[in-house]
């Protein structure tokens, strides 16, 4: 019975109004999205390098990927600390 009530609540929830009340930048801060894209591009470059081996491109893509991941992790930790204050 309780499960049916929960399902009913979920069905009645107005997602459009909730999304409009939250701005997209609050859900996905632009800096973090940019860093995720850096990481994703680094991964794609790394995959291309495995197909077309070239030491210069490999070094660039691996460093891009590592920097992107490091920055993402750093920002995530920073946000967690900000919330905890």
From Swiss-Prot:
Membrane topology classification: Multi-pass membrane protein
Domain of life: Viruses
Protein's cellular compartments: Host membrane
Alphabetized UniProt keyword annotations: Host membrane, Membrane, Transmembrane, Transmembrane helix
Keyword Chaperone included in the entry's annotation: no
Transmembrane helix as UniProt keyword: yes
This protein's GO CC annotations: host cell membrane; membrane
Segments traversing the membrane: 32-52, 59-79
UniProt-recorded name of the protein: Putative transmembrane protein ORF28
Organism: His1 virus (isolate Australia/Victoria)
Phylogenetic classification of the source organism: Viruses, Viruses incertae sedis, Halspiviridae, Salterprovirus, Salterprovirus His1
